[in-house]
């Protein structure tokens, strides 16, 4: 386990002090009481069954997008296009949710999830091939594909998949395709457990299997750099690792989108927005690019995000201010979070 010096602890507390001071100034400038805002933030994220359930719901896609991020980073590919995979995964999972009939619940849900994951993976195939065989930066290509995904799903929701004569949306998915909601009056559903299982499985595969070792060897160090010199020394083709890593990353993005449609909104509509892909990049880094760390960081961030909604409802403080300040607090807590992750991993 890594040793933590007094300097690490000092930097952590200094960061907490500075971010607390900034938060106090920002909140006071809006004419609100910082203590009251902190109380609402805590209540919205951590107090009461419904609020906790909603916090877990907010954490669900973050666990998957953070895991998708860390896998691509570990193979040396900087995938910024997870949002695009979420969009196409959500669209086609929603389509499969009403298109296929006469299926049992488990079969229908599984089919929808597999379709969402497959489409999400295929969405990342082009930037992976462009990077490996043409040297095109995956950062640029995946960012472009994010915009292409938005335009594509908008076209499909307005055209071939449109079922609502008023709004650009698909038909509602069948009950056999729905993920079960755990608590009434909450969007928390069984998708959370799927996300946690997937992240734990990713941890096992990356750290305990030969396949995971070959993937990790595709990058130089924790954050990979493609092509990897280390991989070539071992005789492992880094090209293959890069492509497979991008496909897995896209599949997890598609899974996150599929769970959102199957477990919460129940259909795909044009105004559906996904920003969890970008959040997943920050959370994946905060979790030290380890799946277990991604789970922990996602739970914290999900609670803060839900608490931000509660603060926005109760006060005049913008939710964006709360999330920005809270994320900075999480960054200040990075040393302690790293310690928790190391304790769980060893």
Predicted feature locations:
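Short loop segments and helix-boundary regions at transmembrane helix junctions
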Residues: 2-10, 73-81, 103-106, 110-168, ...
């Amino acid at each position: 386990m890594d040793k933590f010096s007094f300097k690490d602890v000092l930097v952590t507390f200094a960061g907490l002090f500075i971010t607390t001071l900034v938060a106090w100034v920002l909140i006071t400038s809006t004419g609100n009481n910082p203590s009251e805002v902190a109380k609402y933030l805590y209540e919205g994220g951590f107090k009461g069954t419904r609020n906790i359930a909603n916090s877990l719901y907010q954490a669900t896609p973050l666990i998957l997008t953070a895991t998708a991020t860390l896998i691509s980073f570990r193979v040396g590919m900087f995938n910024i296009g997870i949002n695009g995979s979420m969009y196409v995964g959500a669209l086609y999972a929603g389509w499969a949710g009403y298109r296929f009939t006469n299926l049992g619940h488990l079969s229908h849900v599984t089919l929808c999830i597999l379709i969402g994951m497959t489409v999400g993976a295929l969405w990342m195939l082009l930037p992976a091939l462009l990077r490996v065989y043409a040297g095109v930066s995956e950062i640029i290509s995946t960012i472009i594909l994010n915009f292409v995904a938005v335009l594509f799903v908008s076209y499909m929701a307005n055209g071939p998949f449109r079922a609502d004569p008023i709004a650009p949306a698909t038909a509602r998915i069948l009950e056999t395709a729905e993920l079960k909601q755990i608590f009434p009056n909450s969007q928390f559903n069984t998708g959370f457990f799927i996300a946690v299982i997937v992240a734990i499985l990713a941890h096992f595969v990356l750290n305990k299997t030969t396949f995971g070792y070959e993937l990790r060897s595709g990058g130089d160090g924790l954050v990979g750099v493609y092509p990897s010199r280390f991989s070539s020394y071992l005789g492992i083709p880094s090209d293959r690792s890069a492509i497979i890593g991008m496909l897995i990353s896209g599949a997890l993005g598609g899974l996150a989108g599929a769970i959102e449609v199957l477990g919460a909104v129940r259909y795909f509509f044009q105004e559906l927005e996904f920003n969890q892909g970008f959040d997943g990049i920050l959370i994946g880094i905060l979790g030290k690019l380890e799946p277990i760390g991604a789970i922990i960081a996602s739970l914290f961030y999900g609670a803060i995000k839900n608490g931000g909604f509660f603060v926005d409802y109760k006060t005049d403080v913008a939710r964006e201010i709360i999330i920005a300040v809270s994320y900075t607090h999480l960054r200040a807590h990075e040393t302690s979070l790293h310690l928790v992750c190391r304790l769980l991993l060893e």
